[in-house]
């Protein structure tokens, strides 16, 4: 989860988020090198007389500044496309969870079970217990098995919402009349917090998401107790 004054990303807990962090570092290095080169050229122009105001044609230079940006864009596009295909590919999910956005709460349905569904509301600040987080705790957590591929179907009952859990690299729009899907797999157990990431009305800030990733045996006990 995020902490006050945090400047970087949350710790990655899924393969997709790890890939996104690597891509961020890769792209940031390219941006840093380009910015350094531009600042160096500007400083040379301001501090030396190495300027060519009368030059009308320089095919070599034009060739360089045409080919070099194209190469840089390819270096950014290829890993980006790879991650996009990884995020869209869902092969043989072990579990499917349907998520519906409402004003202003989430409802969940485990479609592999006959009657396992519930609503998830934010716990008001006045009812929080010591150690719980303001605006992030819910009355019903989404319990899921770790180290298993899980398909999440996302839609909405009313307006646009967005189901997002940053540490898992998840952000899927909830659109009325449309069913979007994403996949998640956690590499370790724990509580993972998220929030609605699409402005959806006056209580948009009060739609937290809490995923509780547990070993498979614990998930089976929980699901049996909910049926």
From Swiss-Prot:
Molecular-function GO term, any one: copper ion binding
Residues where Mg(2+) binds: 198
Parts forming coiled coils: none
Binding site residues for Cu cation A1: 161, 196, 200, 207
Naturally occurring in which organism (per UniProt): Tragelaphus imberbis (Lesser kudu)
Subcellular location: Mitochondrion inner membrane
UniProt GO BP: ATP synthesis coupled electron transport
Signal sequence annotation: none
Entry note: cofactor: Binds a dinuclear copper A center per subunit.
Protein name, as recorded: Cytochrome c oxidase subunit 2
């Amino acid at each position: 989860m995020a902490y006050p004054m945090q400047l970087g990303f949350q710790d990655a807990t899924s393969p997709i988020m790890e890939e996104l962090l690597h891509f961020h570092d890769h792209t940031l290095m390219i941006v840093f090198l380009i910015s350094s080169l531009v600042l160096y050229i500007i400083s040379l122009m301001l501090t030396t007389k190495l300027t060519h105001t009368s030059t009308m044609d320089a095919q070599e230079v034009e060739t360089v500044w045409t080919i070099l940006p194209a190469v840089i864009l390819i270096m950014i596009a290829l890993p980006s496309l790879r991650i996009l295909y990884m995020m869209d590919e869902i092969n043989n999910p072990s579990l499917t969870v349907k998520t519906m956005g409402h004003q202003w709460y989430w409802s969940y349905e485990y479609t592999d079970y006959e009657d396992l569904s519930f609503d998830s509301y934010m716990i008001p600040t006045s009812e929080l217990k010591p150690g719980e987080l303001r605006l992030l705790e819910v009355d019903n957590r989404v319990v899921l098995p770790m180290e298993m591929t899980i398909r999440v179907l996302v839609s909405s009952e009313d307006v646009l919402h967005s189901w997002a859990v940053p540490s898992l690299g998840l952000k899927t729009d909830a659109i009325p009349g449309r069913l979007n899907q994403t996949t998640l797999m956690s590499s370790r157990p724990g509580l993972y917090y998220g929030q609605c990431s699409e402005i959806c009305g006056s209580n948009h800030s009060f739609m937290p998401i809490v995923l509780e990733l547990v070993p498979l045996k614990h998930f089976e006990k929980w699901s049996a107790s909910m049926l």
